[in-house]
Amino acid sequence: MSQTHDLKTWPVYFDAVKRGEKTFEVRRDDRGFQKGDKLRLLRTREDKPHIVEHGYAIGAGPSHIIDKVITYVLTGGQFGIEPGYVVLGLGDPQ
């Protein structure tokens, strides 16, 4: 059964995903990410990472949230990726 993960994302990376230039995420492997899991990328301020832009807690606008699905999981400890990290392939939800 797939899970949904809310991930805070700095503007430079969020915007690159939004433009379609960045089709992956590098994350600490602390959530048991699996192929088919859903990601909600939340545009977050770099200077205050605990604050999600435009009040996510009370409903951020759609321009500050991107929904993606994990299409591939490359685990760390190989190919120069640190152990404890993953590279997640991102696709559009169906």
Label each region the model flagged.
Residues 2-94:
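Catalytic phosphate/metal-binding cores of nucleic-acid and nucleotide-processing enzymes, i.e., regions
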